[in-house]
């Protein structure tokens, strides 16, 4: 590099003499591109973030120095690097933050202004992403006082070129401008706000390496606070060299100072450097892979970076999932060390005498934080580890765990070993933590954050940081589990009754809610193992409950819930809930009301904890309907199917009589519909159909009617017409082109050869919908599309989401017999545009009759179920089933 710089200097000198401006720009641009290429090659040959930062910073310094000299900026001015460039941490495509510091004057002269504009223009011509400000010393101080971000940026400064004297004045002024208490308050609040922006979790599918909780910005915040404290300490020191050390480039001297001052240990620093390096490597690879400043670890680049780092897809775990686990474990550690260091620095600054309140013989509340009376308590008595979390639940005045206690927890968590887990006292305390009336969610989250939960439950420890790239889950397995538990806790709070009134009412009367929390902890604990995670988790749960002394019936309930935790959502979203046989079968499965209530509460909490996109009012209504129907079936001893049909006929007749419709007018309609019709449709639908169709029993043209769904989100659409083979395909095409998705389709054929189909459609865009004129549009336009004189349109091929493109999900097709002449077709696939329309087309091409369809979208994944047979209830042969399955697989 030094030889290249000297050659560059000679070449520039000759070009300047000749006045060749364009050649000068090309020379610097080539120097930059060649240097950047060499830095990249060296990095990929031997990945070392520190070396890359050093070389990249030197390269840019050289270019800026020549540019500064070329533009003949005032000799009393200085070019100062600030921010990431100032601290010498320059990633491949990071912006260059520059401060052009001018001597005090009333205004920048016209000549100076021209030279500065020339400099900035030159830097842009060179392809550098520059963010610059031009200020005098007094303007710097004014901005720093008004804006904490500006002040922070100015603290991380370095003289690139120009006047050293004015730079020294700048350092002195910045040091004096820092009001340490205010700085700490604002920076901690800034971090809290940043955490809130990312929903207080680092464990998202596409985290921001720089800004997400536990990311590089957490390390920066630690160093900003340390630098501010060190600068303030230096400003009180008579030795001017001490102040220069405080402003020194990079963080090495800051870490050293923390160790000298006994604020951080060498072991802690070693771990910090390890995890910092992981994040820096990922961000560097991300910049190179994206060819721009990209800080989000998006799907587009996860696989490529995982392959570069040597991760392989094995045993059902994607390489990208392994990469993300490494990332999540690093940010988990950084979050903890961030908490330890900030608490330590705040404690260091405090001059107030401690306020101490004794709780018991082992613990105090010191300045609102829990503290042990003896520093060696946890080492000598590991059982007290659980007391830390139990006491925070029992004493709401405690704001958190003191830094000393937090540090001790990190040191002793290795004592949560086999002997600890086998202790009857510790088992009792763990169940006691789960049984507290308040603070269960906070306690378990803290136990997970500090590594205690995974040590006590090794099977939980294995899923910490484990991501699932399945187009459905958006959190790591451990984060999802704790989200489910948090949702259960929300049911316990009367002030949140408005969210889920039924859940709150059921939860308030449920004995032993800690059993629900245990089921939540175990329901996905076997994810990532070979085999069915529900069955494996059930075994773990039963063993855990037995070893913790729970009564047999309680342990069996927890284990049953874990094994059955997908059953209620699957039934609600894949089966026809108006079919009494479905309800009867599900009632026999759950057996009693206690199980039903527990499974309902767990299911709602589980779906809500999976992804913000998955839960909606439609799913809420399905689950609530299944709960109510099943509860009714359990409460009645008579055969539920017979009872349901009789009740529906009676209630529909009463409803129709209120509008003056007598039984004699719709008897023929009901007779032609057949007895099975009353198993497929509910009272409200029967009365709706009867009112509209009684005059049109033998309609010659399609009848389409639409209304707002009386039971929840969406629009309910009824289609009545003579049976035709492409009917379902035409309907799917129509709604697909409207950007509506079908939530449910009830397909029924009357005894006189008419199709009576009812659809629930939902807005696919997530936007608010104006229903003014929409219902009439559907009635008119869909009727036109069903006219046989028009040709069947091909399904649309719209834009797929990035996740669907970049996270391959193998479609799963399952066809199985459910009755003598009926099969169920289950499809799990990426929710690509036009998916349902394509499936409908395939069913038509294979002469398949459809009786019912339940369409379920879970994030970017579709889970669809269809009841099918051959034409006119002809049973499908094995050959036809194979052909149908192959056709769907080929299309998906």
Regions inferred by a protein language model and the residue ranges of each:
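N-terminal regions immediately upstream of nucleotidyltransferase
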Residues: 1-75, 93, 200
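Conserved nucleotidyltransferase catalytic core and NTase-mimicking acidic/glycine-rich helix/loop elements
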Residues: 39, 178-349, 512
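Active-site flanking loop/helix segments enriched in acidic
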Residues: 43-56, 201-211, 370-374, 426-432, ...
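Active-site nucleotide-donor binding segment shared across nucleotidyl transfer reactions
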Residues: 51, 61-109, 113
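Conserved catalytic core of two-metal-ion nucleotidyltransferases
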Residues: 57-65, 71, 110-165, 281, ...
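Alpha-helical phosphate/pyrophosphate-handling elements in metalloenzyme active cores
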Residues: 58-80, 225-261, 474-516, 536, ...
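Divalent metal-dependent catalytic cores for phosphoryl transfer on phosphate-bearing substrates
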Residues: 88-115, 260, 476, 504-636
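Regulatory modules associated with amino-acid/nitrogen control
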Residues: 278, 311, 317-321, 325-370, ...
């Amino acid at each position: 590099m030094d030889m290249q710089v000297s050659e560059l200097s000679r070449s520039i000198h000759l070009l300047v003499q000749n006045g060749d401006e364009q050649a000068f720009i090309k020379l610097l641009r080539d120097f930059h591109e060649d240097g950047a290429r060499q830095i990249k090659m060296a990095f990929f040959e031997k990945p070392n973030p520190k070396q890359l930062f050093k070389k990249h910073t030197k390269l840019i310094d050289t270019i800026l120095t020549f540019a500064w000299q070329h533009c003949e900026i005032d000799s009393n001015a200085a070019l100062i690097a600030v921010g990431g460039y100032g601290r010498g941490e320059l990633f491949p495509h990071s912006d260059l933050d520059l401060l052009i510091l001018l001597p005090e004057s009333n205004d920048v002269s016209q000549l100076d202004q021209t030279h500065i504009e020339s400099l900035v223009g030159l830097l842009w011509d060179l392809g550098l992403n520059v963010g610059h400000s031009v200020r005098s010393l007094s303007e710097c101080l004014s901005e720093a006082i008004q804006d904490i971000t500006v002040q922070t940026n100015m603290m991380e400064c370095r003289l690139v070129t120009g006047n050293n004297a004015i730079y020294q004045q700048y350092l002195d002024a910045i040091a004096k401008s820092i009001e340490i208490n205010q700085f700490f308050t604002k920076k901690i609040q800034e971090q809290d706000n940043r955490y809130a922006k990312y929903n207080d979790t680092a464990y998202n599918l596409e985290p921001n390496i720089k800004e997400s909780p536990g990311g590089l910005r957490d390390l920066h915040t630690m160093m900003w606070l340390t630098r501010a404290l060190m600068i303030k300490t230096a400003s009180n020191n008579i030795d001017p060299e001490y102040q220069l050390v405080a402003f020194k480039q990079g963080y090495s001297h800051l870490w050293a100072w923390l160790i000298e001052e006994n604020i951080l240990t060498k072991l802690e620093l070693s771990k910090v450097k390890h995890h910092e390096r992981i994040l820096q490597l990922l961000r560097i690879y991300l910049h190179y892979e994206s060819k721009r400043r990209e800080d989000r670890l998006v799907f587009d680049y996860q696989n490529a970076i995982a392959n570069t780092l040597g991760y392989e897809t094995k045993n059902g775990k994607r390489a990208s999932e392994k990469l993300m686990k490494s990332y999540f474990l690093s940010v988990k550690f950084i979050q903890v060390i961030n908490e330890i260091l900030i608490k330590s620095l705040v404690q260091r600054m405090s001059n107030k005498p401690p306020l101490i309140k004794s709780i018991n013989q082992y613990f105090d509340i010191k300045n609102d934080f829990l503290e042990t009376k003896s520093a060696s308590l946890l080492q000598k008595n590991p059982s007290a580890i659980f007391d830390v979390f139990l006491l925070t639940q029992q004493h709401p005045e405690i704001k958190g765990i003191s830094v000393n206690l937090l540090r001790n927890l990190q040191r002793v968590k290795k004592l949560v070993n086999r002997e600890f887990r086998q202790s009857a006292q510790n088992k009792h305390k763990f169940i006691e933590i789960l049984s507290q009336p308040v603070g269960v969610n906070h306690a378990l989250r803290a136990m997970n954050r500090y590594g205690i939960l995974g040590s006590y439950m090794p099977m939980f420890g294995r899923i910490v940081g484990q991501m699932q790239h399945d187009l459905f889950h958006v959190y790591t397995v451990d984060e999802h589990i704790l989200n489910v538990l948090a949702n259960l806790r929300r049911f316990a709070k009367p002030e949140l009754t408005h969210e889920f009134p039924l859940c709150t009412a059921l939860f308030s009367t449920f004995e032993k809610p800690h059993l629900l929390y245990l089921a939540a902890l175990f329901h996905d604990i076997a994810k990532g193992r070979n085999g069915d995670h529900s069955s494996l988790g059930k075994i773990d749960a039963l063993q855990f409950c037995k070893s913790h002394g729970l009564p047999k019936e309680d342990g069996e309930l927890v284990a049953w819930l874990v094994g059955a935790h997908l059953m209620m959502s699957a039934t609600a979203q894949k089966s026809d809930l108006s079919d009494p046989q479905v309800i009867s079968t599900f009632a026999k499965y759950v057996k009693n009301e206690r199980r039903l209530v527990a499974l309902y509460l767990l299911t709602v909490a589980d779906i809500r904890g999976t992804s913000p996109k998955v839960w909606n009012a439609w799913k809420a209504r399905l689950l609530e309907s299944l709960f109510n129907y099943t509860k009714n079936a359990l409460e009645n001893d008579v055969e539920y199917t017979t009872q349901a049909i009789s009740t529906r006929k009676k209630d529909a007749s009463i409803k129709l009589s209120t509008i003056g419709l007598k039984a004699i007018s719709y008897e023929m309609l009901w007779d032609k519909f057949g007895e099975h019709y009353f198993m497929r449709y509910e009272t409200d639908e029967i009365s709706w159909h009867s009112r509209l169709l009684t005059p049109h029993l033998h309609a010659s043209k399609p009848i389409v009617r639409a209304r707002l769904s009386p039971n929840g989100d969406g629009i309910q659409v009824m289609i009545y017409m003579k049976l035709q083979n492409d009917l379902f395909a035409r309907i799917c095409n129509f709604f697909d082109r409207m950007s509506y998705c079908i939530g449910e389709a009830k397909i029924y054929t009357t005894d006189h050869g008419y199709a009576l189909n009812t659809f629930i459609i939902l807005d696919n865009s997530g936007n608010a919908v104006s229903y003014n004129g929409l219902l009439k549009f559907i009635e008119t336009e869909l009727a036109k599309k069903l006219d046989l004189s028009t040709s069947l349109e091909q399904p649309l091929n719209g834009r797929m989401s990035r996740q669907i493109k970049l996270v391959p999900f193998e479609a799963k097709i399952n066809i199985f017999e459910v009755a003598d002449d009926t099969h169920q077709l289950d499809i799990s696939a990426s929710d690509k545009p036009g998916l349902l329309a394509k499936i409908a087309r395939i069913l038509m091409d294979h002469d398949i009759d459809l009786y019912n369809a339940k369409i379920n979208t879970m994030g970017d994944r579709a889970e669809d179920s269809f009841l099918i047979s051959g034409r006119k209830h002809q049973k499908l042969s094995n050959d036809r089933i194979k052909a149908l399955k192959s056709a769907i697989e080929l299309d998906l």
